[in-house]
């Protein structure tokens, strides 16, 4: 599922082949994409409609976001007892960093990867490839 109006950020990553991001195409091969605004009632209704044909939800928002959208496990499991619901986030569901965003460059920095990339003496450099995202 992609963000309304802007889509997946990876669609803008070069290089491009036939007008499409080579990176986006490679990591999303064989997938179908939809756009739903979860912040709206209509978006929630669409997700609930899709659940009629789904067994699994995997979401990677910060903890509590899906509850605010009315789509948390407790809100959906009563009407969909078969549902497997996986919540993943950069820093887990609990703990002091739980509500922080989990982006690739943050994982690279906190994991120490940025300290060993780039020219000597330059300070931390982000890897050109989303290495934390791809290795997760």
Regions of interest found by a model, annotated:
Residues 1-135:
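N-terminal helix-loop segment corresponding to the beta1-alpha1 unit
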């Amino acid at each position: 599922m992609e963000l309304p109006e802007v889509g997946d950020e990876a669609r803008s990553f070069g290089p491009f082949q036939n007008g499409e991001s080579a990176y986006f195409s490679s990591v999303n091969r064989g997938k179908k994409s939809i756009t739903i605004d979860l912040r709206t009632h209509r978006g929630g209704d669409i997700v609930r409609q899709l659940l009629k044909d789904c067994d699994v939800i995997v979401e990677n928002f910060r903890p509590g976001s899906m509850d605010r959208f009315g789509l948390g496990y407790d809100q959906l499991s009563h009407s969909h007892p078969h549902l497997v619901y996986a919540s993943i986030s950069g820093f887990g569901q609990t703990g002091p960093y739980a509500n922080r965003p989990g982006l690739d460059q943050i994982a690279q920095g906190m994991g120490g990867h940025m300290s060993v990339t780039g020219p000597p003496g330059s300070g931390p450099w982000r890897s050109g490839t989303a290495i934390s995202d791809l290795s997760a």
